[in-house]
Every structure is written in C-alpha cells, then in structure tokens.
Curated annotation (Swiss-Prot):
UniProt keyword Amino-acid biosynthesis, yes or no: no
MF terms in GO: DNA-binding transcription repressor activity, RNA polymerase II-specific; RNA polymerase II cis-regulatory region sequence-specific DNA binding; zinc ion binding
One Gene Ontology term, aspect cellular component: nucleoplasm
Full protein name: Myoneurin
Keyword check for DNA damage: no
Any one GO BP annotation for this protein: negative regulation of transcription by RNA polymerase II
Modified residues (Phosphoserine): S288
Gene name as annotated: MYNN
Family per record: Belongs to the krueppel C2H2-type zinc-finger protein family.
InterPro entries the record matches: BTB/POZ_dom (IPR000210), SKP1/BTB/POZ_sf (IPR011333), Znf_C2H2_sf (IPR036236), Znf_C2H2_type (IPR013087), ZnFinger_BTB_dom_contain (IPR050457)
Amino acid sequence: MQYSHHCEHLLERLNKQREAGFLCDCTIVIGEFQFKAHRNVLASFSEYFGAIYRSTSENNVFLDQSQVKADGFQKLLEFIYTGTLNLDSWNVKEIHQAADYLKVEEVVTKCKIKMEDFAFIANPSSTEISSITGNIELNQQTCLLTLRDYNSREKSEVSTDLVQANPKQGALAKKSSQTKKKKKAFNSQKTGQNKTVQYPSDILENASVELFLDANKLSTPIIEQVAQRSNSELELTSVVENTFPAQDIVQTVTVKRKRGKSQPNCALKEHSMSNIASVKNSYELESSGEELDQRYSKAKPMCNTCGKVFSEASSLRRHMRIHKGVKPYVCHLCGKAFTQCNQLKTHVRTHTGEKPYKCELCDKGFAQKCQLVFHSRMHHGEEKPYKCDVCNLQFATSSNLKIHARKHSGEKPYVCDRCGQRFAQASTLTYHVRRHTGEKPYVCDTCGKAFAVSSSLITHSRKHTGERPFICELCGNSYTDIKNLKKHKTKVHSGADKILDSSIEDHPLNEQDSIQKSPLSETLDVKPSDVTLPLTLPLGAEDHHLLLPVADSQPPAPDALLRPAANGYSEPQLIFLQQLY
C-alpha cells in the first residue's frame, strides 16, 4: 500500500528540523549569514554540494558572496525543502545566479523561463516608447492601471474602478463613484500640468506596476518621457495631447526603487484585451497621495507565515529570521549562532560569567532581567500575576501558566520524531531526545562528569561545594535539592516512621560506616565468631538422618547415631551454624 502524501510529509518534517536546527549536520556560510541544513538533502538537489561532500567531511561550507547572495540562497534552500519557488523581477537574477553556481538545474530552467517573461524590462524598445513624440496604436477601449502588490495591503480600503477611454467624450478616465471625502479627479487637470502621485517606497519596493493603454483603433499623438534621476527615482510620465477639446489627461506615476537594482518592474505595454472582466482587483490611482499615505501609515507590518503583527518593519525583518533559519550573529568563543543580537549578548555572559542584574534582597545575580523578575516572584513573595482559571494557582510568568494549563487540557504539542512520545514542554522534549542521542553537554569542571540536563549538573556541583540551599522549616535539616527535601517531609513529618538522619539520606553510608556507627559497636566488641547466621536449607526425607541433636557442647551419644530420623517434615528447617575461624 502506497501513501500518496508520504513524500510531502517527509519534506515537511525535514524542513521543520532545518528550521529548528535539529539533526543538521552542515552549515552554509555566506559572509555573515549562516544556514543550517542536512548534507544528504543538499547533495540530492545540488551537484555542487554532492561533489563537495564526496571529497570532504567538513561541516562548514563557505560560499563566494560574489557568486551566491544570501537572499538568493535562502530562496533556493526553501525550494529544496518545500518544492515552492517564488520568483519575481527583483530576485530572479540572484536565484538564477545561485542555482547556476550550485548546479541546481531544475531551478536554472525555471529562472530562464521567468526571465524571458520579464524580457520587456531589459528591452524597453519592445514597448514602442518614443522618448519625444510618437504614435501609439491602441486596439481596445480600455486604459487600465494596476498596482498589484498594493492590492493585497489596501484591499478593504481602496476602491476598484476601471478607467475607460472614450474618444467621443474626450476623457480617458472618469470615476464611477465618489467617496465620502472630496478628491480631485484625473480629468480635472489643465493642459500641460503634471500631477505626481508619490507612494511610500516600501509599498512600491516590490510592486509590479503595469499600464495598459487600449483604444478602438485610435491613433493619438502621445508624449512619453522616461527619465532616470540621480536619486534613483524612475518617473514615467504620460502626456496625452489635447486632441479633444472637452478633457485633458495628464498622468504621472513615480516609482522609487533601491540603489543597485537593475530595473524596476514597471513597463508600458500594449495589450489586446479580449475579456476585461477577467482582470480582477484593479485599482484606480487616487490623485490625493497624502490621504493614501495616511491610510498606509495605519497598517502595521504582519508576518505572512505566523500572522504576528509588529509595530515596525525592522521588527518584522528580525522576526523573519526565525522562519528562514538565518542566524547572522555568531559567538566567536564557541561558534554558536543566533537570530538576534541581544541573544548573542546574553549567551556571551555564559562565557564571561557576567551577571549585571542583582537582587536587592539577597544579592544574587542574573544574566537576564527576566530571570531577576522570575526570581523575585518565586523567592521573595512578589506578586504572581498569572492565575489559572481552572484551579486558581498563580504563576510568576505567562509561559509557566501556559505549560500548567496543558495539564488540564491534556495538550502535548511537542512530539519526538524517533519514538512518537509527546510532551507538554519543549525543554522536556529536548532532554528526551538526548536519551536517544546520548548527548550530555553539561560537564562538571571539578570531576569531569557529564549530564544531559543542566539542573543535574547544578545539583551535582553542590556535592563539591557543600552547598545545601533547601532547608526544612520544621526541623532545620538541609538538602542539596528539592527532591530530597520533599522526600524528607513525606517520611519524617507526615507521621511515618523515623528515618535516618538527613546526612545519611543525602550520602548513603557504606557497610563499614554502618558497623562503626551501630549502637552495638559503642558498647560491645563483636567478633565474627560470636555471630550466628540463620540459613534456610531445603531438606529431603533422605537427609533427615544427617540431623544431629546438639546440646551445649556435649558430643552426641553413640546410640543416637543409630536412631532413625523423624519423618513428616514438610517445611524447610532452620539450622544455626556457628562460624568457625
């Protein structure tokens, strides 16, 4: 039986492992960027990586930045693990260059096809644009201006209108409806005046702006001017001469693009549009750019992957590193990489031992401020603001409350890829996986013993330092960990029988210590010959004649040797033998 979605499921699991850095056995380094991946996956899709891993076992592969850009490689990596490839006029060249260098032939083919579709960008002559004057033959009756990327952002706010050209009326554009606010229409401009609509650069940064001019076999003199200014603004101005006395239309679209980009995705095309209804979500440019800017400023950037909303675009860019697996901040002491700079700063403190956040009550230091807040709430009676709705227990952090709530709901979202066991906490899954791998990253500096869990190392180190921070408030006994303290309270202070002293519980005594500390050893000098040992021996009927009565130290009588043994013994007999030395 073959499962149709088995391959997709495998790729999905591998991609999740890559994003989490789990079982990744290689790191691709491009400048300051690092990408975790699996060798066998890369070698399966790239002849370049296949050749490298046949000849070397190095974990790190350094790629030439002039040949492979980080953004292009990121898209290529996503294609390898997901099978999806999003190409546009901005990234197609970088992806094609990276795929060609790494010998990913399938992507090279796709990029070539896509670049042919974008050929009008590299060859403006195909659009028949005259720099000064010219005649453009328009075949249909529609003039449509589409701003594609802005479509998805202002879908609910911007009206969708179709700008139609009617030579008899003498107007190329006319609004079909009026909004509540007063706006100036395109057809209200005077002859020779240019109205420039400026959009925020981040809106049009990846936008694809296409201007479709069609008329019913209309030959109209038109002035087209394409000028690239020094500040990297590409301004496309269309001035239609006043051939009809009723209306004059002047349209200007300003598209800002970043420095270093080859050509913006903006072109003047001629199309024979047989079915105008098939064109959806076409937007009419408003002459009031200020109002559009105000509406756009209210929109907050949102992650397309998880839906999280951010106050600033820079926060979104940092957040996207989590989904892409990009970790540009590397520790120079141990080589560990992080997605954010503050994570690296906190990590470096584990090497330096710096703890800048001090508790005012006990002078204990912490590497992070959140650790200090948690400590104060746990040990110094500060308010625990997070309360469980089911059992009313209060917690110091929201994450602790979330984990606790899973006890009531039974939710266990973290699954082991090896055995299928589920866990409520991610850290518990991490410790569980180490049982499979045998990894023990926490090593004692004193004796060299290694542990899979950091708390085990902390408890172990107290044996070297003699620290016993857990004290019983009833009797004053102290312990190295909370587990032994709870055990002590259960056995000693719950009405059960008394157990040994806490020192014996913490450090079990050996045989020699038990003899030396026995009450008998303080009063009597016990010799081995004075100790009788009860032995249980199974005796058969034929063995009964071997039993000899022993009275004091007198030898048995001669006739006793001939006396028959008693019959009917059904239970094992206890014979006390005196040890002879």
